[in-house]
Amino acid sequence: MFQYDFSNHQNRHIRITDMPAEYFQRIQETTRKDPYYPVWHIAPKCGLMNDPNGLCEINGIHHIFYQWFPAGPVHGLKHWYHLTTKDFIHYEDHGVAMYPDTESDSYGCYTGMALKEGEKVHVFYTGIENEEMIPCTCYARFDGEKLTDRKKIVEMDPDQTTMNYRDPYVWKRDREYWMLTGAESKEHEGILMLYSGKQADSYEYAGRVRLLQNGQEAMLGYMLECPNYYEENQKGVLFCSPMGISSENKFDYKNVFSVVYMIGKPLDLSLIHISEPTRRSYI
């Protein structure tokens, strides 16, 4: 019986179209028969489900995408799968929404988000460009059914970051779009890259976001994944997942990758810093 060998990172870039039909059908049947297959929660028909992405609501329908490697329960070539729901109990399956089939994401469609603006829905995600695994930030439009107009909008700057560069988060303030992307600096410190743009699909580099505590820049591990930011009650709230973080408190940051939130003054977009953030272990 044919079976892919995923040891030593073999066969991690298999596409649905590459898999023998018999194999694909068999692993789906095996998954369906699993007595522990989730009843209420979203789960893939086979393979590996990674981050939920691009969450948005359109006319009372909630759209959920997630990263999917169909060939097996290991990390491999990521596609985006699409589901919808009205009540988060019953789900409608729409199949693969995004294949890794453009120049900008041919080696994987990774973490992203959706920004709803009136009738428009902008989607931002990390694409892996080639076999050298070079990351970039990509853009797509979502019309409620399909993701279209996919393209690269920001390139990784190899003079500033390592290959750890991913997870765009975008918001709009007044008439300008702002994007945060998590990264590892060349000095192996966790940093947030800030970009600005007049259009949702066009950005220029603005600088690194500094997290100032008592006038000193706070360091959080060697990489900051999945940044998320919003403002409320004259405060700026930043979420991120630091890699390589430690603490003198034996109860802090005991997950493999923890999540933290910081509450401080709103992000100063001219000086590019968040001042006096408090830091708490979130998970």
Regions found by a protein language model. Name each.
Residues 51-72, 94-96, 110-130, 136-140, ...:
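Hydrophobic core segments of beta-strands in well-ordered, beta-rich domains
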Residues 178, 189, 203-244, 252-266, ...:
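Catalytic cores of carbohydrate-active enzymes
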Residues 2-62, 68:
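N-terminal regions that are enriched for targeting/export leaders
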Residues 272-283:
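Single conserved hydrophobic/aromatic residue that forms the stacking wall/gate
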Residues 46-49, 102-109, 159-165, 216-222:
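Short glycine-/Asp-/Thr-/Trp-enriched loop segments that recur within the blades
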Residues 81-85, 136-144, 192-199, 254-267:
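Beta-propeller blade signature
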Residues 77-82, 88-117:
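Blade-loop segments of beta-propeller domains
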Residues 89-93, 144-152, 200-207, 268-272:
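Beta-strand initiation motifs
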